[in-house]
C-alpha cells in the first residue's frame, strides 16, 4: 500500500505528464519500470520480449493518461493498460505450437511427490522461469487466470478462443508446471 506522500508524488507526475513534460514521463517510467516489467515477464518468452511489451505498454499509458480518472488507483489502472499491451503484443506476434505435443503432456501422469512441499522450496525466480517455458497461448491463459483473476469467459473474449479452450490451456499448464516442479524437486533432493 502506498503512502499519501507517495500517492501525491505520483499524482503530480501524472498531471505533469498530461501537460507534456517529458521529465515527468521519465520519472513515472523509472518509478514503475520494475513492477510493470514483472507483469510483462509473465507473458513474455524472454526478457527482451518483456522489454518490447513494456515499451508498448508505457507508450499506451502515456498516450491514454487523459482516460485515467484520478479517483482510482493509478498503479491498478497502469497494470491493466500494460497487461492489455502485453496481450496485444502476444496476439500480434503469436507463436504457433504443436497441439499434439501439448495433448501428450496433458495426459502424462504425475509421480507421487508432495507438490506443495516442492513449490515451497522454489524461489519466485524459479517459478517465473518455469511459467516462461510454457507455450505462448498457454502461458497467457495461465497468467490471466491465476495472476490477473480473469474468468474463462473473460479470457475467451480477450483472446478470441472458446471458454473450453481456455480451460484446457489452464489445465494443461497446471499439469505441465506440476510435472516440472516435481521433476525439479527430485533433482534438488538427490
Regions found by a protein language model. Give the residues of each.
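Short amphipathic alpha helix immediately N-terminal
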Residues: 29, 133-152, 183
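Internal acidic/polar
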Residues: 6-7, 96-124
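Amphipathic, Lys/Arg- and hydrophobic-enriched alpha-helical face
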Residues: 29-47, 64, 131, 183
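Structural recognition of an alpha-helix C-terminal capping motif at a helix-to-coil junction
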Residues: 38, 52-59, 72-84
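Sigma70-family region 2
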Residues: 18-19, 42-45, 55-73, 92-94
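DNA-recognition helix of helix-turn-helix
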Residues: 87, 138, 147, 157-184
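A short, charge-rich alpha-helical start-of-domain segment used by transcription regulators
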Residues: 14-38
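Arg/Lys-rich amphipathic alpha helix in sigma70-family domain 2
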Residues: 66-69, 80-100, 120, 183
Amino acid at each position: 500500500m502506498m503512502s499519501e506522500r507517495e500517492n501525491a508524488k505520483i499524482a503530480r507526475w501524472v498531471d505533469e505528464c498530461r501537460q507534456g513534460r517529458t521529465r515527468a514521463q521519465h520519472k513515472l517510467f523509472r518509478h514503475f519500470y520494475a513492477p510493470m516489467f514483472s507483469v510483462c515477464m509473465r507473458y513474455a518468452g524472454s526478457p527482451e520480449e518483456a522489454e518490447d511489451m513494456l515499451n508498448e505498454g508505457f507508450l499506451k499509458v502515456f498516450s491514454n493518461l487523459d482516460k485515467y480518472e484520478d479517483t482510482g488507483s493509478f498503479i491498478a489502472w497502469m497494470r491493466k493498460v500494460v497487461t492489455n499491451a502485453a496481450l496485444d503484443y502476444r496476439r500480434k506476434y503469436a507463436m504457433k505450437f504443436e497441439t499434439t505435443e501439448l495433448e501428450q503432456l496433458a495426459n502424462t501422469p504425475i509421480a507421487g511427490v508432495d507438490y506443495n512441499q516442492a513449490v515451497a522450496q522454489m524461489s519466485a525466480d524459479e517459478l517465473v522461469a518455469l511459467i516462461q517455458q510454457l507455450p505462448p497461448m498457454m502461458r497467457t491463459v495461465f497468467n490471466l487466470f491465476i495472476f490477473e483473476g480473469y474468468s474463462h469467459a473473460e479470457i475467451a473474449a480477450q483472446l478470441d478462443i472458446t471458454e473450453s479452450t481456455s480451460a484446457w490451456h489452464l489445465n494443461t499448464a497446471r499439469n505441465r508446471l506440476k510435472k516440472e516442479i516435481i521433476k525439479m524437486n527430485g533433482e534438488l533432493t538427490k
